[in-house]
Amino acid sequence: MSGIGSKRAAGEPGTSVPPEKKTAVEDSGTTVETIKLGGVSSTEELDIRTLQTKNRKLAEMLDQRQAIEDELREHIEKLERRQATDDASLLIVNRYWSQFDENIRIILKRYDLEQGLGDLLTERKALVVPEPEPDSDSNQERKDDRERGEGQEPAFSFLATLASSSSEEMESQLQERVESSRRAVSQIVTVYDKLQEKVELLSRKLNSGDSLMVEEAVQELNSFLAQENTRLQELTDLLQEKHCTMSQEFSKLQSKVETAESRVSVLESMIDDLQWDIDKIRKREQRLNRHLAEVLERVNSKGYKVYGAGSSLYGGTITINARKFEEMNAELEENKELAQNRHCELEKLRQDFEEVTSQNEKLKVELRSAVEEVVKETPEYRCMQSQFSVLYNESLQLKAHLDEARTLLHGTRGTHQRQVELIERDEVSLHKKLRTEVIQLEDTLAQVRKEYEMLRIEFEQTLAANEQAGPINREMRHLISSLQNHNHQLKGEVLRYKRKLREAQSDLNKTRLRSGSALLQSQSSTEDPKDEPAELKQDSEDLATQSAASKASQEEVNEIKSKRDEEERERERREKEREREREREKEKEREREKQKLKESEKERESAKDKEKGKHDDGRKKEAEIIKQLKIELKKAQESQKEMKLLLDMYRSAPKEQRDKVQLMAAEKKSKAELEDLRQRLKDLEDKEKKENKKMADEDALRKIRAVEEQIEYLQKKLAMAKQEEEALLSEMDVTGQAFEDMQEQNIRLMQQLREKDDANFKLMSERIKSNQIHKLLKEEKEELADQVLTLKTQVDAQLQVVRKLEEKEHLLQSNIGTGEKELGLRTQALEMNKRKAMEAAQLADDLKAQLEMAQKKLHDFQDEIVENSVTKEKDMFNFKRAQEDISRLRRKLETTKKPDNVPKCDEILMEEIKDYKARLTCPCCNMRKKDAVLTKCFHVFCFECVKTRYDTRQRKCPKCNAAFGANDFHRIYIG
């Protein structure tokens, strides 16, 4: 393709000029290398040789150009890579420099309190590398991006200005930027120094001992910190806003980068495809050049020559002779005339065919109408019509009879089915009633059983509790009786000890009166000091043992009480949980019973509404059964309440056992106190015996004084003992009252035991009642079973009725059979009539055969006419063809007789060149050459038209309206 185009282009500037003139023109402009063509016999050979040499030179020039293009392409790629690395490094430097300036500005805003530095670094300029514009379709997008970015930053295109400016201007601009950064850094240093000075002043004021200075420093520091806080808050808000805007811009830029990367990948793929296409075209061009050279060599070697006034092999193509061109034009005109003649003939034939078809249809319609009229007028048709009408009337009558029989049969069947359905409905409703009643009774029975089981379990629990409490109660009775006896004995002993004390006091008074001498005092002085501390020790030990014993007994009692209290609390908690569970179960059962009763009542109401007129007796029975069941339910609920009360009574028993434990502890305490009193009485008796012995001794007089002192001490002790005795007596009274309370409590417990026994008896009676109810329910169940049997008997009776109805149905079916027999006889008569009709049809067939014979003869005549007309048409056709041949031969004769008025070959070539140029120009704009192909439909246009169509979203082929996309058009290179 490119080779052919280049050859034409080389030969375009006037082919009529001879080669000598061409060389002269070339010499006038440029120096051309001389080429030896060898021996040439004619101008045609000279043209061929010159063209061959031109082709070779052009091929060499193309190879050189291709090599230069490859070198330049590699050089361009290297430069692009270098530029990309330089741009990347410049962008990195600019980014970090701008970041540095931004950080300096933020630091100044952060620390400079005196002046607002919002506009400090307005001179800061961002290094932005202008991206290359690879395609025309992306230019508009970049313009839009620039328009958007113009309002965002004041100095946006620093690198662009650097690229457009000279080296001196670049140095000045960079110097300005460095100066601005240096000034910002120096300002940071000054700000930091100011802050340092301020901090030092505040620290001096704070460190100074003066309170006023400290207050001033604190106030200044507070104000400073408040200002700093507000400034920092503003700064954080500003930075947050900036961060938001930057994040949004970053997301936008990231999306743009992704789209650009996808576009770059698409463009790279397109470049690869185009490169591959170029390589392919070049290979093809080289192959064609080689092939053309071989063809030319063969032509030269074999000695082919092309003669004619303007014939020449130009650019690898052989031009056409003018005479041949005229001949071809003449032939084309003749062919046009022939085509017109043929078209006229075809039109005539089509019109004739339409006329014949219309006549044929008319004749068919006339034939049909004529045959029907003829058949209707025949006497056989009229006879058949009368017979058909008679038979049709008879068949209608038979149909009416048959329909009546069918309606009767359907009616009887319908009534029978309705009766059966009614019986089945009654049976189903009765079954449902039975089921509901049985289910209700079973539910009530199950509830009664559950309640009975619950009561039995509770009764067993109460029995077990009573069995456990029985031996405890017996032991308590024995203990109480033994304690009563023991208390009586203790009272007697106390009275006896009181008497002994009175006697001892009287004896002591007597001894006081007797002892008066000093001898007894001296004798007693040696022995009494030894005895007194021993006695005192004994008394103190007795008191300690008494207090320890009382404390131990109290602790034991408290421990027992605490254990019992814990056990009772656990029991109470368990019993409460059981009660709650039982109450929940009972509530659930009650709800179920209510739901079931509601459902049963609804079902009964529905059943009653359906069968009000039929089952009055059944209603009364059901109402009585329901009343009985309700009464039994009420009784069961009352018995349940009584059982609950009994359970509560049994649960209250452990609390009374607590009082028993307290009484036991009080009794133990009183026993211990009585034992202590006995021991003290024994000690006093021993002392009296010792004193009597001492008084009998000779040294009694000496010890009188000591005895008097001892008497005083003993008097004090006696007063103490009296007080203790009074306390013991009060305690004895308290124990007596407690004992009386215990007796009363025991009486109450006995009453409760009796009540429990009565409750147990009631439970047993209720159990007997429940057994009786169970028996009654069984009897009711048996009655219901009897009712079921009666219903079954009713169903059997209804089945008998159904059988009778079926017998009636059989009778009706026999009647239908007789009717069908009559119908068969009628059908036989109809068949006889059909036979007659068949005979008439045979007659009609004979007539048809005669008619067909006549039609055959007519067809034969028609065929002969058609054959004659066809032969005539053939003769006419041959005559026309002969006339056309004569006219064509006459034209040839005229052309041979005419002189040679053939135009020059250069004019023909120029017209061909114009035609080819018109073909190579774009049909959309009629300006540019075709250099883009649509791969969907393979129509060729210029790349600018296709691109504008793609950008303006008119993505359809201008010729065939085939849709195309971004990857569906490619560049092509034609010469």
Swiss-Prot record:
This is E3 ubiquitin-protein ligase BRE1A. Component of the RNF20/40 complex (also known as BRE1 complex) probably composed of 2 copies of RNF20/BRE1A and 2 copies of RNF40/BRE1B. Interacts with UBE2E1/UBCH6. Interacts with p53/TP53 and WAC. Interacts with PAF1; the interaction mediates the association of the PAF1 and RNF20/40 complexes which is a prerequsite for recruitment of UBE2A/B. Interacts with PA2G4. Interacts with FBXL19. It holds the Pfam family zf-C3HC4. Keywords: Acetylation, Chromatin regulator, Coiled coil, Metal-binding, Nucleus, Phosphoprotein, Transferase, Ubl conjugation pathway, Zinc, Zinc-finger. Its EC number is 2.3.2.27. GO terms for biological process: chromatin organization; negative regulation of cell migration; positive regulation of DNA-templated transcription; positive regulation of transcription by RNA polymerase II; protein polyubiquitination; regulation of DNA-templated transcription; ubiquitin-dependent protein catabolic process. The modification Phosphoserine is found at residues 41, 136, 138, 522, 562. Residues 543-552 have a biased composition (Polar residues). A zinc finger (RING-type) spans 922-961. Component of the RNF20/40 E3 ubiquitin-protein ligase complex that mediates monoubiquitination of 'Lys-120' of histone H2B (H2BK120ub1). H2BK120ub1 gives a specific tag for epigenetic transcriptional activation and is also prerequisite for histone H3 'Lys-4' and 'Lys-79' methylation (H3K4me and H3K79me, respectively). It thereby plays a central role in histone code and gene regulation. The RNF20/40 complex forms a H2B ubiquitin ligase complex in cooperation with the E2 enzyme UBE2A or UBE2B; reports about the cooperation with UBE2E1/UBCH are contradictory. Residues 139-151, 527-540, 558-622 have a biased composition (Basic and acidic residues). Belongs to the BRE1 family. It comes from the Eukaryota. It is found in: Nucleus. Transmembrane segments: none annotated. One of its GO terms (cellular component) is HULC complex. Residues 1-37, 125-155, 507-622 are annotated as: Disordered. InterPro entries: E3_ubiquit_lig_Bre1, Znf_C3HC4_RING-type, Znf_RING, Znf_RING/FYVE/PHD, Znf_RING_CS. Pathway: Protein modification; protein ubiquitination. Its main location: nucleus. It catalyses: S-ubiquitinyl-[E2 ubiquitin-conjugating enzyme]-L-cysteine + [acceptor protein]-L-lysine = [E2 ubiquitin-conjugating enzyme]-L-cysteine + N(6)-ubiquitinyl-[acceptor protein]-L-lysine. CDD domains: RING-HC_RNF20. Residues 43-90, 168-375, 429-898 form a coiled coil. The modification N6-acetyllysine is found at residues 21, 348, 510. GO terms for molecular function: histone binding; p53 binding; transcription coactivator activity; ubiquitin protein ligase activity; ubiquitin protein ligase binding; zinc ion binding.
